[in-house]
């Protein structure tokens, strides 16, 4: 009797089924890991923007620290943003919708709030107006949103930070004009 080399049809089918099961398990895990990393990039970039805004506040004497009831808004275009220009998906950060807002609290503490919006032709994605405290939590990646409505305009930003309407004279904006 001659010895046969090779696999039977049953053996080949078994290998294909096993590989299919492995793929069904592996692909969703890889996709969720990539999405989690993209969200972590937004949170990291938002924290970098706050750090750069703090540096800008220390080095630029033209910018006043806010008094109680006031807001200082530093737009992305005004802050020396270093290497933070695009998000992990290649979207450019919007210069008018991305900013850091400083709020003076009742206990003489300056709160930093950030909004970071990456835009392309069809959608936006980023971190809606959020406090530095919230960005420091382990759940910060849950703050990243897709196709959200950014908080824009002095009045809306002031209202979002204080929960009430603030006089336009108490909101100071700093942005570079082209």
Predicted segments with their positions:
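Sec-dependent signal peptide cleavage junction
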Residues: 26-42
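Structural motif detector for alpha-helix initiation sites
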Residues: 9, 73-76, 168
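Short, compositionally biased strand/turn segments
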Residues: 1-7, 63-66
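Extracellular/periplasmic head regions of type IV pilus-like filament subunits
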Residues: 61-133, 137-139
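Membrane-proximal N-terminal amphipathic helix
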Residues: 38-63
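N-terminal single-pass transmembrane signal-anchor helix
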Residues: 3-30
């Amino acid at each position: 009797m001659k010895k046969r080399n090779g696999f039977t049809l049953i053996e080949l089918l078994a290998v294909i089924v096993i590989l299919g099961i492995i793929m069904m398990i592996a692909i969703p895990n890889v996709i969720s890991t990539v999405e989690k990393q993209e969200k972590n990039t937004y949170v990291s970039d938002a924290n970098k923007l706050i750090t750069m805004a703090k540096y800008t506040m220390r080095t630029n004497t033209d910018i006043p620290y806010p008094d109680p009831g006031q807001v200082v808004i530093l737009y992305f275009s005004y802050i020396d943003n270093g290497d933070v220009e695009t998000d992990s998906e290649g979207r450019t950060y919007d210069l008018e919708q991305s900013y850091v807002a400083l709020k003076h609290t009742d206990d003489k503490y300056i709160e930093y709030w950030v909004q970071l919006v990456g835009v392309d032709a069809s959608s936006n994605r980023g971190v809606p107006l959020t406090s530095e405290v919230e960005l420091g939590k382990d759940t910060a990646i849950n703050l990243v949103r897709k196709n959200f409505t950014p908080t824009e305009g002095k009045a809306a930003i002031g209202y979002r930070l204080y929960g009430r309407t603030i006089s336009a004279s108490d909101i100071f904006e700093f942005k570079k004009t082209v």
